[in-house]
Amino acid sequence: MDSAPLLALTLIVGVPVLFIATRIFLYPFTGLCLWVLLLPVTKTMADLAGYPQDEGPIMLQKLTLADPVLLLTAVGALLNGTGSSSRVTDRQGRRIIILLAAFCVANVASAALGETGTESLIELATNFWLCLSLVLICQLLGSPDRLRRTLTAWEGAGVVGCVAGGVGTLLMWRGNINNLLVQDGRVAGLFHGINQLQSFVVAVIPFFCAGMFSRAASRSARVLYGALVLVGFAGVVGSGSRAGVVIAALSVWLMLLFASPRLALVWTCAAVLFAGSAWQVLGKHLDELPYGIRRSFSYVQEDNLELDELSRGRADQLQTFYTVFAEHPLVGVGPGGFAAWVPRVVPGGKAQEMHNSYLGVLGETGAIGGLIMLALLADAMLRTFRFLQWASRARDPDALMAAQALLVSYASILMYGMLNYGLRQRHFWFVIALTVALPHVYMRWRAGARVAERRTRPFYGVVPCVE
């Protein structure tokens, strides 16, 4: 390439990147919003550089576009301050952060005493990165306005993720089974892994449902939210996840149950009445559908629902977990070390990580790390329940809608974690951060708003009020 075109290309790419980097360094909250927008983009640098799936330098396989953004945000917040005088510092919120830090320490101990050795360094760096992101979010989300803008960025990320999944399903339907959005006949969107798409969609759908079922939202806004829910659901179907389809449908039903119990009962009765005939029609034409969709509904044609028949790989992992936990009950085999044990325990078994998040933590970090993580997850769930109870007593429709969306979103990704390992996914920890920040900021705003006559709702335009 000649020097002139190369210089022009460098300027075209370098100037915007330099501007964004400077903006993030000077205003760290801008970096947080950009990081949230990049949550549905987990294609690694190796993918973008053209390497085949899971090949290339190990650092490029782990590095994503959002990682430099988070690093600049952290440096900017450290050197320039967070720009917010109010931080999430209530006792329960601090306890969740401390539990995550304790889990990182347990990972270090497990890596030192386990069998993985230096192979655990990447996993340790990942856990540290997740802890850093949680602390940053809680430090930067100290005001209602910032929380509102962050939730707007979260919905924007949901639009990107759902639309990418929907477009991927359309391409797969037309026979294009390998492209940027489809991997081997299954939709992955802009995610590096197929399971990441499913987990992200079930986490963001409740927030779209909050807008779709809101009486205060305009008709066009409700139609738009409804379309996003359908497109996101289509992406989950195209990804070939049987569990993802069930959990996504359940999250929509739970939000409908919160909004209108009678309407939820009507839809439930209609589904029960027409499920049998729809099941038969789907079973007859299932072989004509693309692979991803066919896989999502493959249990329609199954006569035996035993785990060994449905998923041999999961059965091998469960057998491996029993052996691993029996031999390493306290500190586990080390972060990232479970996969190597599968072929050692099960002859001919495939080396892959445990699909169950909670059993995977117990196997890799033992009872010590597993109990710390389970305590963290339980504490976050308790916090969402308390926020929902507070919002119900406060009779604030805006807070109630936000609490319902947060509870369903968190419960959905916890259920999904029973079937796929999701504790390393960034959007999972973003939802955890929302369980820490959202109740604190809203209760603080509510207490301060009693003095003021006119006030702006923290979630106005994001989770519309039902008034």
Locations of the language-model features?
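Short aromatic-rich membrane-water interface segments that cap or initiate transmembrane helices
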Residues: 55-65, 183-196
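Hydrophobic transmembrane alpha-helices and their immediate junctions
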Residues: 365-412, 439-440
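Alpha-helical transmembrane segments of multi-pass inner-membrane proteins
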Residues: 1, 15-23, 74, 101-112, ...
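Transmembrane alpha-helices of multi-pass inner-membrane enzymes
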Residues: 72, 376-379, 405-467
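Flexible juxtamembrane loops connecting transmembrane helices in multi-pass membrane enzymes
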Residues: 181-190, 279-319, 340-343
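Long extracytoplasmic/lumenal interhelical loops at the membrane interface
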Residues: 178, 301-319, 323-365, 388-391
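Aromatic-anchored transmembrane helix interface
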Residues: 63-69, 95-105, 117-142, 158, ...
